[in-house]
């Protein structure tokens, strides 16, 4: 559906509009690609009104269980904003016959890709489970649909009000975090169901009562207002009796009256200027246009994609690449039922005249609306998006799989085949229709928002930690209360025994694909695994580089080089690269992580050869043009400023260098962006030399997963990489012998006045390498802090309500690995939260070791979820690369069940106790020092004040 494709476009790159040279071969036609997108399914409806969609996909022993309710924030009346989302949280706190946390059950049945989300038009809940646990999942979903009311308590409600309030604060605390409130509150008039944000008002949330929540459930959570999708190792004949068994006896609920709301138009242009802690000025242009079912929406989607969504978009070409007055530009459409949001935004280059950029943006937009896109632009939009949809068909559930496509169509327009019709519309789009739609809808009055660097207004909070950012909103004029029938959805029509939880009936074995190996004539090793569920192929050419290869005085060079490799080759401009990708429906990218630099390709099978040509050109022949280098430098410097303007960015930049020391390969910011002064000093010769010595055939390995064979792919790789040689010697091995500083327990406090939350990041470099067997240690950490059900998350989030989410993790690395704890917490509980983390770690290593129940849950959950973990070819590709990095055999995934089953509580306790010493943890806290420091002083640890701006290579020496 367009909705899914639009969200994918939010992450797309940018490039120039020069005409690419003709391809040696003709790419597959768009119509052929559309034919490959197919989700056959059966539909049936229970007597109580529950609509059920079943799609059969036997590639793995898993089933996606996804349930969508026709209720969202649009259904919230006056004084109850945020209730739809708050109730989504309540749904995870246990039902009458499944008491306790919902995730307690999903963990022990091996669920993957699980969550719940709320948006304007819907609330959904989803999980992918082993086939043997399907009945378990149906029991859980049906129990919270039909048997929730008696399990909802004031204590649970109060806790989730705290959790959601901290979720809101966490979002508001990000750069540009307040813009969406201004957009919805201005574009949609008072009384429109989209006038307020989904997260709602803290004032309204704090006033929520137990009766409010129970009535919300009664009014909206009947089976007749829901769609259940089962996709995977199941068919309708198997599904019907199970669905009837668990859902059939739930009584029909109240009918939810449809919401009817016209598309609003502003009376006149509105200009708003906001201040925020942002690296540069951002300019917005916003309109409301028709909802997702309107034919004009498809045309607008195409037009906006060509304007600012494609890698070759016009905005990026003109403002970012040619005129270089901006460091980023995008345009996209987010579709909803009662109106869609058009968002066009430009990030002004630091030092450029924002007024001039805004004027130029409006000129470009006016010209584009007048002339429309070219036929080739329309074709590239269609090809690239349909190819992405094909790739998405590999996943049955999750946030964007086949279950989502079916459910959205059925819920929003009453047609589960809507995804196919949308793609057919996309393939048939014409420039004339696109131009007409833009002239009709984008010439109306516009909302112009400008966010400038500066201090945002003081974040106000009132008693009991509640406050209001969106204000108390009027009742939507188009809100229609549910029918007045006196029935409760919690009352069953007849008895169904729910006294015993249906445990999984077995443990499906993981069938990890066989990895074949070969070697090209120049010595490059190739590793191949076949996955043919969809006609796509993924290729990763991995180099032993990464930002651990950055010299200490050139931190950021690996990231700069990676970006530059896609910005033009000796035969193609950056625009021509982007346009070629779009014509082929391919995705070519280069990126660096800590230990590796990887050039990746996702290709549709019919265009594999042409796509490999492009990948090879990007790897072997980058031009590193000086003008492109200067533009990329400004973008990277702006990225550094952006990282320094958000709490998490500050923390992950500052703490790792202190832990490892500035001379260690891991002693730079873990974002890989480097420091402003090192990036400013990197010259073209530096980048060329780095590429010559690190992107070298002697440091390369090729990984391939997809719908091909080693016999077919090897000759294709041999032609493109087998004769590749270099006159230069490869770079020497990274110097991991550099000593890591002795760990020191202290608190580093970075002051951010008026911050609504504090960000706590704690760390320790462990005496362990990534190639060591860390499974036992990671299993112990899963219980301590690595999982939603972990001790620290359940304490700080589910018991105390001080945080939206807390985690600890043991990162992967080629050399010594770090242990981190991450906790965004409300300001007035910062000190107590740190004490909780310290005490929990001490207790874990001492008086409260791993329990038998925790061990069983960890073993069972990890074993059962193995088939779901490797459903997608991208996961197989990632596992292959991880195995190679960590010197493991390629059948490692298939040995995991045995390894987990062999774990003992004593082994987990010993692993954590030996490796993670609470007295050696370094703490970095970003927050309002005036409010936070007195709390921290009570902990008795040394406190060092660190200036927020002092984030240079010199300031991060150990």
Predicted features along the sequence, with ranges:
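Gram-negative bacterial Sec-dependent N-terminal signal peptides
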Residues: 1-22
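Proteolytic maturation boundary segments
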Residues: 23-53, 235-275, 286, 317, ...
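M16 family metallopeptidases and their MPP-like homologs
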Residues: 55, 60-78, 82-86, 100-147, ...
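Short, conserved charged micro-motifs
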Residues: 134-136, 236-240, 295, 352-356, ...
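A common structural junction motif
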Residues: 142-152, 247-254, 363-373, 618-624, ...
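Short, conserved secondary-structure transition motifs
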Residues: 163-171, 262-276, 382-393, 603-604, ...
């Amino acid at each position: 559906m367009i909705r899914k494709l639009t969200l994918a476009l939010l992450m797309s790159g940018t490039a120039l509009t020069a005409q690419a040279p003709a391809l040696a071969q003709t790419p597959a036609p768009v119509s052929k690609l559309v034919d490959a997108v197919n989700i056959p399914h059966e539909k049936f409806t229970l007597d109580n009104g529950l609509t059920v969609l079943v799609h059969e996909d036997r590639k793995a022993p898993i089933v996606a269980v996804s349930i969508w309710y026709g209720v969202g924030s649009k259904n919230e009346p006056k004084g109850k904003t945020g209730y739809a989302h708050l109730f989504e949280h309540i749904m995870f706190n246990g039902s009458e016959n499944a008491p306790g946390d919902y995730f307690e059950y999903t963990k022990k049945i091996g669920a993957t890709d699980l969550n719940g989300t709320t948006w304007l038009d819907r609330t959904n809940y989803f999980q992918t489970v082993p086939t043997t646990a399907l009945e378990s999942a149906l029991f859980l979903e049906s129990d919270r649909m039909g048997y929730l009311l008696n399990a909802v308590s004031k204590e649970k409600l109060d806790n989730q009000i705290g959790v959601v309030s901290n979720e809101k604060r966490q979002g508001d605390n990000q750069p540009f975090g307040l813009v969406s409130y201004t957009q919805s509150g201005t574009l949609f008039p008072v009384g429109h169901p989209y006038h307020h944000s989904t997260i709602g008002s803290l004032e309204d949330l704090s006033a929520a009562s137990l009766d409010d929540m129970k009535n919300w459930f009664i009014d909206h959570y009947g089976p007749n207002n829901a769609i259940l999708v089962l996709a995977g190792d199941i068919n309708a004949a198997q599904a019907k009796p199970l669905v009837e068994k668990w859902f059939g006896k739930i009584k029909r609920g109240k009918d939810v009256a449809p919401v009817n709301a016209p598309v609003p138009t502003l009376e006149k242009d509105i200009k708003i200027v906001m201040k925020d802690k942002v690296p540069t000025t951002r300019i917005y242009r916003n309109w409301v246009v028709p909802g997702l079912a309107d034919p004009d929406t498809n045309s607008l989607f195409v037009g906006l994609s060509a304007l600012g969504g494609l890698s070759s978009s016009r905005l990026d070409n003109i403002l970012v690449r040619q005129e270089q007055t901006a460091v980023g530009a995008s345009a996209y459409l987010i579709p909803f039922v009662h109106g869609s949001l058009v968002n066009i935004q430009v990030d002004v280059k630091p030092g450029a005249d924002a007024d001039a950029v805004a004027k130029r943006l409006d000129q470009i937009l006016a010209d584009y609306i007048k002339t429309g896109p070219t036929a080739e632009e329309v074709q590239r939009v269609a090809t690239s998006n349909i190819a992405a949809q094909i790739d998405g068909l590999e996943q049955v559930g999750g946030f964007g799989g086949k279950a989502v496509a079916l459910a959205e169509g059925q819920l929003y327009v009453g047609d589960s085949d809507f995804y196919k019709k949308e793609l057919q519309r996309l393939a048939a789009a014409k420039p004339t229709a696109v131009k007409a739609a833009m002239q009709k809808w984008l010439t109306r009055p516009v909302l112009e928002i400008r966010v400038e660097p500066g201090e945002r207004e003081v974040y106000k909070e009132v008693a009991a930690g509640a406050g209001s950012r969106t204000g108390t909103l009027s009742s939507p004029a188009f809100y229609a209360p549910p029918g007045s029938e006196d029935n409760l959805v919690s009352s069953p029509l007849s008895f169904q025994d729910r006294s015993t939880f249906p445990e999984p009936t077995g443990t499906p074995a993981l069938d990890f694909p066989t990895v074949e190996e070969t070697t090209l004539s120049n010595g490059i090793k190739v590793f191949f695994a076949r996955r043919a569920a969809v006609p796509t192929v993924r290729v990763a050419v991995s180099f032993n580089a990464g930002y651990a290869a950055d010299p200490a005085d050139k931190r950021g060079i690996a990231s700069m080089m990676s970006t530059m490799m896609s910005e033009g080759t000796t035969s193609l401009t950056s625009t021509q690269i982007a346009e070629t990708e779009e014509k082929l429906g391919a995705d070519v990218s280069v990126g660096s992580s800590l230990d590796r630099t990887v050039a990746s390709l996702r290709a549709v099978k019919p265009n594999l050869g042409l796509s490999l040509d492009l990948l090879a050109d990007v790897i072997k022949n980058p031009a590193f043009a000086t003008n492109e280098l200067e533009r990329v430098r400004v973008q990277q410097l702006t990225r550094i400023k952006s990282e320094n303007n958000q709490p998490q960015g500050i923390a992950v930049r500052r703490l790792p260098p202190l832990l490892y020391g500035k001379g260690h390969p891991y002693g730079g910011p873990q974002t890989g962006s480097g420091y402003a002064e090192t990036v400013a000093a990197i010259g073209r010769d530096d980048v060329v030399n780095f590429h010559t010595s690190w992107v070298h055939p002697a440091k390369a390995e090729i990984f391939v997963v997809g719908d091909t064979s080693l016999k077919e792919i090897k000759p294709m790789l041999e032609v493109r990489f087998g004769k590749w040689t270099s006159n230069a010697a490869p770079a020497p091995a990274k110097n991991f012998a550099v000593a890591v500083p002795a760990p020191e327990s202290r608190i580093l406090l970075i002051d951010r006045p008026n911050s609504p939350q504090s960000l706590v990041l704690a760390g320790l470099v462990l005496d362990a390498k990534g190639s060591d067997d860390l499974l036992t240690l990671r299993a112990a950490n899963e219980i301590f802090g690595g999982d939603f059900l972990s001790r620290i998350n359940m304490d700080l989030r589910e018991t105390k309500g001080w945080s939206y989410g807390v985690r600890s993790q043991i990162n992967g690395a080629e050399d010594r690995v770090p242990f981190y704890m991450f906790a965004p917490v409300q300001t007035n509980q910062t000190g107590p939260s740190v004490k909780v983390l310290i005490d929990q770690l001490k207790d874990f290593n001492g008086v409260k070791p791993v329990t038998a129940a925790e061990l069983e849950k960890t073993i069972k959950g990890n074993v059962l979820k193995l088939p779901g973990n490797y459903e997608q070819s991208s996961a197989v590709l990632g596992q292959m690369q991880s195995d190679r990095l960590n010197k493991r055999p390629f059948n490692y995934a298939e040995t995991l069940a045995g390894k987990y089953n062999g774990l003992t509580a004593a082994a987990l306790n010993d692993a954590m106790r030996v490796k993670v010493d609470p007295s050696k943890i370094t703490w970095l806290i970003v927050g309002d020092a005036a409010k936070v420091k007195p709390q921290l002083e009570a902990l008795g640890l040394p406190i060092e004040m660190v200036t927020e701006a002092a984030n240079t290579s010199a300031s991060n020496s150990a």
